[in-house]
Every structure is written in C-alpha cells, then in structure tokens.
Amino acid sequence: MPHVEIKYSDNLDIDTKQFFDDIEGVINKKDSGAGECKSRAYPCSEYKYTHIIVSISLLTKAHRDKEFTLKLSNELERVIKLHLKQSAYFSLNIEYSQAYYTTNIHRIDADTLDDINSSS
C-alpha cells in the first residue's frame, strides 16, 4: 500500500489524476505486489521559486534494496518530469516504513472504497 504525496507551487500546471496513475503504474511495474497507491496533492499558493517535491512511502521488504530503490527512483523521475511543462526545482524522496508502522483497510458494513472490491 504505497503512499504518494506531491507538494508543489501552484503555478505548475499538473494533471494530478494522470500524474498519480503514471506513478502507480511505475511502482507496480517494478513491484507487482505493491498495490494501490494512496495519493495526495498539495498545491501551494504561497511559495518562493517554482518547485515540486514528490514523496513516495513504501513498506520495507527484502527485495526493496538499494539497487531496486535506485532503479525505481530513476524511472519515477523520468515519468514525473514528463508531466512538468515548465522549469522547476525538483525533489523526489523514496522512504521505507519503520518497524512499528501499521497499514490495513478499515471497513464499515455497506460502505465501499473506490477501486476496492467489497469481498474480503
């Protein structure tokens, strides 16, 4: 269950839905067990310099080593920059969960989540 957050100066014209779909596609291509990416965008109207920072949070797993992370980072940077149509300061951070991180799905009867099957 990866998480994606983008924080950016709001003078950047970004189609966040396509942006998130493309990032999720890269992550799942590199790691088919990653699953749905919970994604959030934070455009900022008060800023100094045009910029974007993308933060990717993943669970710690044995196969997500330095080599995996470097390849993922390079591919994510390439795909993210396809969405940037103007010059900007760019930052990308990939981080891994700590030992006491909890993640799951909280379900309420008769309630649904987007893109989650109700069977489980």
Positions of PLM-derived features:
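N-terminal first-folded block
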Residues: 6-38
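Short active-site-adjacent helix-start/loop capping segments
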Residues: 47-49, 64, 100-102
